[in-house]
Amino acid sequence: PGEELDYFLIGGESLEEVLVNYTDLTGKPALPPAKTFGLWLSTSFTTTYDEETVTSFIDGMAERDIPLQMFHFDCFWMKEYQWTDFEWDLDQFPDPPAMLKRLASRGLGLCCWINPYISQKSKLFDIGMEKGYFIKNPDGSVFQTDLWQPGMAIVDFTNPEAAKWFAAGVRKLCEMGVTAIKTDFGERIPTKDVVYYDGSDPYKMHNYYTRSEEHTSEL
């Protein structure tokens, strides 16, 4: 026989009721802070930027009388190929707390990009290897791939200690003044020949992994 596909039919007397019934199954989303409904500005696809660049972007919006509520720091707030280590590139951002405080004083919410893939150049790589915080191969070795960064490992959020470890990095950013987190990726997850800490089915984890990442960032 070929592959199977499961369907879930969720009904209701109206579209509103269908949505209520659907979220009964998936969970009810929390209402985001009001600021997040405003205009966002991102450094996405800007591969080299520093504090001066960020300030020029924000000043440019003000000069054009375009109201701005959120500013997002994409990949390169960290050093290239050290994703994710939760460490600012101090060559480009010498004093991150002071910068964040200055930007917040302008009424901006501040967002940083992260992902659960740990580069071999990241300071977190050796820690995760030693403590068993990464998804593993069936032989017990750490699963590594070159799909995003050379030899990267993937955080195993089914391990409670690994989840706490990753969440500590998120908390560090928030305590510094970051008010939102972009939890990127999570979709490039191996669906066979890997082992999770809690024995989860890798095939099913393909869809559940991103929820685990999001939940961890809320810890």
Where are these regions (language model features)?
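Short intrinsically disordered, low-complexity coil segments enriched in acidic
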Residues: 1-5, 214-219
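Carbohydrate-recognition beta-sandwich/jelly-roll modules
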Residues: 1-69, 100-102
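Aromatic- and carboxylate-enriched substrate-binding clefts and catalytic-loop regions
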Residues: 67-217
